[in-house]
Amino acid sequence: MKEDPRHIHISEYSYPLPDERIAKFPLPTRDQSKLLIYRRGEVSEDVFTSLPGYLPQGSLMIFNNTKVIQARLHFRKETGALIEVFCLEPIQPNDYVLNFQQTVHAAWLCMIGNLKKWKDRQLKREMTVKGFPITLTATRGECKGTSHWVDFAWDNPEVTFADILEVFGELPIPPYLNRDTEESDKETYQTVYSKIKGSVAAPTAGLHFTPRVLDALQEKGINLEELTLHVGAGTFKPVKSEEIEGHEMHTEYISVNRSTIKKLIDHDGCAIAVGTTSVRTLESLYHIGVTLAENP
């Protein structure tokens, strides 16, 4: 009898990972990273530029084209206390594109750093965006699990919420890097094919691809398709429960074009998902399809 996955102990997934084995910064040329090969029971190493040589001709590769947003907003209180408001998911409006286009007001579900210091309902910060001086106000609303509803308001209709994030926000890099965000991260912590803004973390399996690797894949006859999954708060939220059942999972936004779905259905060869975000999008797509077929 298979074990109920809800009762799997988190401790079974613990393993040592020395800090010195974690690269704090990427290589100057991202496709020169190491490539681990497991083939016919043998393990070997290569460089990432060699990837096309290991993949079957005629394969279909699926990439996640999400783009990381500068989701960390910092407010300094008069007492000197620093409070971080980490934007996770748009609430009003709940569509990412519409929310980024908002002027004057937008609401997000946020994680709050140093919450105990946020005693008044509102935080304010003055800034200059696109040459306009504005005052950004953050009002804390109801608590939803470990997150809070936060209303953002500003006093200039020429400025969008996307503008505010671009100027005021900080890119969220993984906590295991144990370093502050740097200006170079705005480029290196994005995939070269990132397009659709919305993630709070990069789909890291795609970070090693470069235009020359993508060109080499296509030259071999490998078809490239894209979908979107905006990586959510689960990336940063530690697992504190002893069993999987006790861990709160966050939902994530996905979008797959009709043309991509048709290619997936019609494709008879090998389908290769780049990273776990692409995998769980495809798994969710299948689940949604089965559910709709059974309950039209």
Locate each region found by the language model.
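A cross-family signal for N-terminal binding/gating loops and helix N-caps
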Residues: 1-296
